[in-house]
């Protein structure tokens, strides 16, 4: 039986764990920050985008965990994109591996105190479980306040998805929602009732999403469905041909053509935990072998197929 407690260092000399499930899906998770650097479906197709420019302990792409803060303060007025310099990512923080005995899941933990933490002067426990199912991957996050005082935080999972051609992709599930447009200094707007397509740079924070978002790739004839619990907000980002912004974010000039970032998070209203209180967030990514070319996606259909 394949084991997930075998740690290898062959991804840019970074320790990682391999996950497998009987249907053929696989994933690779770094011990630094619990970053997912590969997720393949049962046909062996890579579903996550990783930039060739990536280097060091923060390879760009995949799925990153951002905690305890996005933006300057976390208040709704000052929410900023998860792609700016104010992101507090866990990518450079080593997590403790707890073998599960199951080759399709892994548990990673981080326990800090206010005195020994370089990332945040608070005492807390963070637990992450990454699990694989048939053409499905789930990420469960658990944060407990072990400090003597209350603290607040925001949280996000940055999902860099591999697409065939960004101009041939559409996103459904964000129609008519309010969003903050970071290309217009955070101006609050309302999305149109149609599916979102791309012909230029996009950097938006959507509030109170319905829990199911579909990324439809016509050329690859597949749909990735993101289902969330406890992560009500979403960030939609593509630098398009803004080479300066792509470079600052750690991507190559042409990376935008085959990449789309659709993030899940708690951004509008930061989580407040009193001592001993806990918070949980859940994300499920699933694959449907269809591009829904016949028309606008029926949310009930997405909800049906996305459920475990």
Residue map of PLM features:
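Beta-strand-rich recognition/accessory modules
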Residues: 1-25, 32, 42, 111-115, ...
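Acidic-aromatic substrate-binding/catalytic surfaces of carbohydrate-active enzymes
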Residues: 22-83
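Short, well-ordered beta-strand segments enriched in hydrophobic/aromatic residues
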Residues: 27-29, 130, 137-145
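Short, hydrophobic/aromatic beta-strand segments
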Residues: 30, 38-41, 149-156, 295-296
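Extended, loop-rich substrate-binding clefts of extracytoplasmic carbohydrate-active enzymes
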Residues: 78-134
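Coil-to-beta-strand transition motifs
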Residues: 103, 121-125, 132-138, 148, ...
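Short, acidic/polar linear motifs in exposed loop/turn regions
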Residues: 146-149, 289
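Active-site/ligand-binding surface loops and adjacent short beta/alpha elements
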Residues: 150-152, 160-235
């Amino acid at each position: 039986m394949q084991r997930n407690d075998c740690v290898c260092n062959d991804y840019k000399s970074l320790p990682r764990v391999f996950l497998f499930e009987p249907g053929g899906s696989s994933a690779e998770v770094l011990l630094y920050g619990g970053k997912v650097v590969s997720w393949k479906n049962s046909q062996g197709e890579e579903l996550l985008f990783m930039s060739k420019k990536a280097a060091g302990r923060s390879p760009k792409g995949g799925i990153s965990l951002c905690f305890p803060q996005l933006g300057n303060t976390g208040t709704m007025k000052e929410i900023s994109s998860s792609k700016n310099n104010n992101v507090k990512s866990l990518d450079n923080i080593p997590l403790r591996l707890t073998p599960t005995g199951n080759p399709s899941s892994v548990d990673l933990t981080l326990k800090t105190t206010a005195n020994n933490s370089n990332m945040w002067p608070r005492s807390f426990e963070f637990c992450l479980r990454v699990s694989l199912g048939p053409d499905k991957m789930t990420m469960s996050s658990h944060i407990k306040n072990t400090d003597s005082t209350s603290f607040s935080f925001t949280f996000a999972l940055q999902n860099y998805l591999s697409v065939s051609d960004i101009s041939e992709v559409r996103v459904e599930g964000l129609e008519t929602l309010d969003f903050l447009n970071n290309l217009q200094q955070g101006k609050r707007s309302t999305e149109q009732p149609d599916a979102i397509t791309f012909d230029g740079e996009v950097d938006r924070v959507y509030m109170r999403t319905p829990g199911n978002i579909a990324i439809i790739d016509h050329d690859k004839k597949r749909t990735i469905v993101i289902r969330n619990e406890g992560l009500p907000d979403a960030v939609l980002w593509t630098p398009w041909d803004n080479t300066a912004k792509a470079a600052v974010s750690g991507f190559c000039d042409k990376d935008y053509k085959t990449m789309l970032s659709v993030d899940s998070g708690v951004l509008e209203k930061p989580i407040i935990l009193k001592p001993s209180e806990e918070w949980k967030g859940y994300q499920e990514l699933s694959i449907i072998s269809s591009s829904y070319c016949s028309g606008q996606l029926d949310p009930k259909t997405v909800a049906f197929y996305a459920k475990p």
